[in-house]
């Protein structure tokens, strides 16, 4: 394999841009920490951290495969490996299978409940990239896909699923819809031209308000979750920081400009980090 080909595979998996993996990692850590009520089992932690990066990479590959005929028409994606001809469609599919199988082999080291839940996760990861052709709500499907690590991680740590799991699932789904709508705002003009659907297009002039409502709902449910689990003061400091970051994101997207909207999307990494730190300090 040449250096150019290796670099193309690396870029296809977004290993050069790990923001997506980090946004998937934070809620996974929330679930592990809360299920353990402290530090999770080291083996489970290692499996899920590796699994997050493998499945996020698999999701990026199948997403680019699904979009291979349209990415060349979008300014932000025109130089990705598939539209640039650096990786073939067949090679991308083979890479997706390799990554998905590797993730599944990791899951096989977990308990039966986690293994059963993983089949839904794989299905969501495969289906999501194709949704933008059929519905204006692909961000909702992404929210489900990015949140499915929560019941899986909880099941792996506790071997059961409690009602709090599904509250956390809903919290992350709402947050995901909010930040992926910010991401979709970057490409909205191009997407309208080529017929790609998104919540950014669906929400139209209400986009900023709806993102704000989703962020408010996320924080409100996080407060309710903290009260239900009797989490400590550190948790609420984490939520306060997250609230400040959400306010900053609203400032960034106020004019709907491409780069500030993208910066708002990236800023969500710090939201996830703040909440994770709050949970960790509260349960440790």
From Swiss-Prot:
Alphabetical list of Pfam families matching this protein: UbiA
Swiss-Prot/TrEMBL GO biological process terms: ubiquinone biosynthetic process
Primary gene name: ubiA
Membrane spanning stretches: 19-39, 42-62, 93-113, 114-134, 136-156, 158-178, 210-230, 233-253, 264-284
Substrates-to-products reaction catalysed: all-trans-octaprenyl diphosphate + 4-hydroxybenzoate = 4-hydroxy-3-(all-trans-octaprenyl)benzoate + diphosphate
Gene3D superfamilies associated with the record: UbiA prenyltransferase (1.20.120.1780)
UniProt cofactor(s): Mg(2+)
Protein name: 4-hydroxybenzoate octaprenyltransferase
Family statement: Belongs to the UbiA prenyltransferase family.
One GO location term (cellular component): plasma membrane
UniProt cross-references to PANTHER family, sorted A to Z: 4-HYDROXYBENZOATE POLYPRENYLTRANSFERASE, MITOCHONDRIAL (PTHR11048:SF28), PRENYLTRANSFERASES (PTHR11048)
Organism the protein comes from: Vibrio cholerae serotype O1 (strain ATCC 39315 / El Tor Inaba N16961)
Location(s), subcellular: Cell inner membrane
Keyword flag Methyltransferase: no
Keyword field: Cell inner membrane, Cell membrane, Magnesium, Membrane, Transferase, Transmembrane, Transmembrane helix, Ubiquinone biosynthesis
Superkingdom of the organism of origin: Bacteria
InterPro entries hit by this protein: HB_polyprenyltransferase-like (IPR006370), Prenyltransferase (IPR039653), UbiA_prenyltransferase (IPR000537), UbiA_sf (IPR044878)
Subcellular location, principal: membrane
Biochemical pathway: Cofactor biosynthesis; ubiquinone biosynthesis
GO molecular function annotation: 4-hydroxybenzoate polyprenyltransferase activity
Role: Catalyzes the prenylation of para-hydroxybenzoate (PHB) with an all-trans polyprenyl group. Mediates the second step in the final reaction sequence of ubiquinone-8 (UQ-8) biosynthesis, which is the condensation of the polyisoprenoid side chain with PHB, generating the first membrane-bound Q intermediate 3-octaprenyl-4-hydroxybenzoate.
Enzyme Commission number: 2.5.1.39
Membrane topology reported for the UniProt record: Multi-pass membrane protein
